[in-house]
Structure formats: C-alpha cells, structure tokens
C-alpha cells in the first residue's frame, strides 16, 4: 500500500517542481468520529508514514484531522502573500470498497478487499490556477502560457514572408505562436 502512496507523492514532487512551488506535507490521522477498526487505521496510517519517510522530505503529523473513512496526506503551498493553501491530497479509504463489496484475488488466490486511494494532485483546479497566477505574477512558464510568442513584422510588405517562415519554424518546434499582421495599422490608429 505504501508504494502506491509513494508513487502519488513522486507525482506531487514532479508537478509542483515544474510549477515552481515549495510545499509542505502533513499526515492527518484518525478523527474522533470515524469508521473502521483500530487495526485498519493503524495499518493505513503506517503506510502513509512510510511513504512520507520515503520522500526524504520533512513532514509533520496532524493528529485527528483525517477523513472519517481513512487517514490522508495533505500538501500545502504558500502563496505570494505567505498564506498556506491545502492543494494536493492523498487519502486512504478502506470503508467504501467494503461497503461496495469490492474484491480482488491476491497472489495466494485469496479474496481480499482493496484499499481505495483518493488522489488529487492539484486539489481544486480553480484554487491552483489562482495560486499559480499569483505565484508567477501573471508571467506563466513558457510551456504553460496561453500566448507563448508573437511574431510582429514591422512592415508587412518588406518582412511578411520572413515573419511567416519564422512563425512556421516556431510552430514546428511545438510553440503556440501568434502572428500579428496589422501592427503598422494599429500604430497609425494609436497616433
């Protein structure tokens, strides 16, 4: 179980690293009102701790803040103003598979109930986009930018063919390139 959780945390590291976020992790354990027996909770919490240790990053315990159906790892990022936002989460759920009667056959041929992993790498997409816009001050990384580059020929007559050739090369390289063909007309309008 911990290996699957560790894989989720590796994905968090890759995604948040690409986005340029520093993040912290917390292991949230069994709340007062919860479902399931002590042994299942202890096993699940142990798997989360093992996966967190495997990352080599610091993490904290967050006693009693797990979901009613299982423990979880919360990943928080700081925005440009220093506020913390909970974004990614990896949650273990051993209640729903049991309630739905889900089963699998293990290597020994025994019927077992799986543990469900709820994984949200970005968390709420809207929240993540807002944090990312604030974090980058609106200057998105090139690979994520909706406008990666623009070709603006100063004179359409004299530079138009060359500008189109450059645009095609950038397009072939996988960049989204806007071609602004009416630049001179816009300058005249402004004047």
Go through the PLM ranges and name each one.
Residues 1-191:
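NTP/phosphate- and nucleic-acid-binding module
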């Amino acid at each position: 179980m911990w290996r699957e959780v560790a894989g989720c945390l590796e994905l968090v590291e890759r995604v948040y690293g690409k986005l340029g976020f520093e993040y912290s992790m917390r292991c949230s354990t069994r709340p007062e009102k919860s479902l399931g027996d002590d042994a299942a909770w202890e096993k699940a919490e142990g798997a989360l701790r093992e996966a967190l240790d495997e990352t080599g990053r610091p993490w904290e315990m967050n006693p009693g803040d797990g979901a009613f159906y299982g423990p979880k790892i919360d990943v928080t990022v700081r925005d440009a103003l220093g506020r913390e936002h909970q974004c990614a989460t990896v949650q273990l759920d051993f209640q729903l598979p049991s309630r739905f009667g889900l089963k699998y056959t293990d290597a020994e041929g025994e019927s077992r109930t799986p543990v469900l992993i709820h994984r949200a790498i970005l968390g709420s997409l809207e929240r993540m986009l807002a944090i990312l816009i604030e974090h980058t001050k609106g200057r998105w990384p090139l690979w994520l930018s909706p406008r990666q580059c623009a070709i603006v020929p100063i004179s359409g007559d004299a530079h138009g063919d060359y500008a189109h050739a450059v645009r095609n090369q950038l397009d072939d390289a996988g960049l989204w390139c806007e071609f602004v063909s009416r630049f001179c007309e816009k300058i005249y309008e402004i004047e």
